[in-house]
């Protein structure tokens, strides 16, 4: 069993890696983002019927999201952050403006509205060493749709 000091040190290290990954995403430094993500990662994203398997598929999904919201930004530092062992949770806000087409999983295309969202955004993540292997993201998709003029 890990001691409190070991657990606290591990949590602090993982929070640093998470911040590094989100700051790299905000800077569109995808080489650094890819170094943080495990090749066999799984991502659970609100609104998707199935999880995303693999870092390449996750990267492709994020690129599609950025085509819809080119100014997408995840705020750091995280106002809420905690963890235990290989798991951490961070809660912050994410913002973006709907200025590019959105392609739904069924192929339907939604034209941009030019409206912005500002949502509480959280992620619970599991780490394998220094690589993120599970992401469970959470945010209010109904509120996002309302803010974007889609509901």
PLM feature spans:
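C-terminal and inter-domain tail/linker signature
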Residues: 2-151
């Amino acid at each position: 069993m890990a001691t409190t000091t070991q657990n606290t040190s591990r949590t602090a290290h993982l929070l640093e890696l998470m911040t590094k990954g989100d700051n790299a995403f905000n800077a569109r430094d995808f080489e650094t983002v890819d170094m943080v993500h495990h090749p066999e990662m799984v991502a659970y994203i609100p609104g998707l019927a199935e999880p995303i398997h693999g870092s390449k598929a996750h990267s492709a999904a994020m690129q599609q999201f950025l085509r819809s919201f080119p100014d997408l930004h995840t705020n750091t530092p995280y106002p809420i952050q905690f963890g235990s062992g290989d798991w951490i949770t961070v809660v912050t806000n994410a913002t973006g403006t709907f200025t590019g087409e959105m392609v739904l999983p069924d192929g339907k295309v939604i034209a941009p509205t030019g409206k912005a969202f500002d949502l509480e955004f959280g992620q619970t993540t599991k780490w394998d060493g220094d690589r993120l292997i599970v992401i469970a993201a959470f945010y209010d998709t109904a509120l996002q749709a309302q803010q974007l003029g889609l509901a």
